[in-house]
Amino acid sequence: MDGNVLLAFGLTLFAGLATGVGSLIAFFTSRTNTKFLSLALGFSAGVMIYVSLVEIFVKAKDALTNALGNTNGYWMTIAGFFGGMLFIALIDKFIPKSSNPHEVKLVEDVNAIKPQVNEDHLMKMGIFTALAIGIHNFPEGIATFMSAINDPNVGIAIAIAVAIHNIPEGIAVSVPIFFATGNRRKAFKLSFLSGLAEPVGALVAFLLLMPFLTDVMFGIIFAGVAGIMVFISLDELLPAAQRYDETHLSMYGLVGGMAVMAISLVLLV
């Protein structure tokens, strides 16, 4: 178990640090490769949706039906699944639209923002975006950590998928802060800090959830994780992938992500 805990923390840290990668891309490239980003985000959504519905939801149902019986266990699984969706939806609800990490940002936005825009406003926008992404990343950290504790292979897949979708979030933080301050280091630091919410989520899961991890608690948490992952995929990843490129690339990425996840689960059984 100790080895799994260390791996789980490492995976959440890896996923969170991808926001810093996004800010570096914004600073050191002149154009956004929208086709690649669309394909990658679609792939990330495919991995998340497939592993959530085929692996995580099923494990949650098995744990709850074993503990509560078939009928009660299945109802509790459904409640946990949609409870996870409601949880992440409420987080999104209270994030201001201008700071929402769902808003697509491009590297070109660094040069596209007009100089007459108030710099204080841009700075506030960047800080609010960093806070919003931090809040948004917190439950993702819990989800990645708990998945890795139960099955490291599933945890690795989820961490990679989360890392991919954290890259454009890093761009969303760094663009307004860089333009407001002209300071790459400050923009990178705030982007980096927003990503640390994921390992903080993992730490909370370890300290508050792990000591009480009965079969019922495990099943409810895993059902909630599945709901969170599916909601993020449908509400964030796929729409963003389609906005980056309006062809079928996002759907090809989605199917590819599902296929890779399906094959890897079979090979790793």
From Swiss-Prot:
Mediates zinc uptake. May also transport other divalent cations. Zn(2+) binds at E140, H165, E169. Fe(2+) binds at N137, E140, N166, E169, E198. Keywords: Cell membrane, Ion transport, Iron, Membrane, Metal-binding, Transmembrane, Transmembrane helix, Transport, Zinc, Zinc transport. Its main location: membrane. One of its GO terms (cellular component) is plasma membrane. One of its GO terms (molecular function) is metal ion binding. The chain crosses the membrane at residues 5-25, 38-58, 75-95, 125-145, 158-178, 190-210, 212-232, 249-269. It is a multi-pass membrane protein. This is Zinc transporter ZupT. It is found in: Cell membrane. NCBIfam families: PRK04201.1. The keyword Translocase does not apply. Signal peptide: none annotated. InterPro entries: ZIP, Zn_transptr_ZupT. It catalyses: Zn(2+)(in) = Zn(2+)(out). Coiled coil: none annotated. The keyword Transmembrane applies. It comes from Lysinibacillus sphaericus (strain C3-41). Belongs to the ZIP transporter (TC 2.A.5) family. ZupT subfamily. PANTHER family: ZINC TRANSPORTER ZUPT, ZINC/IRON TRANSPORTER. It holds the Pfam family Zip.
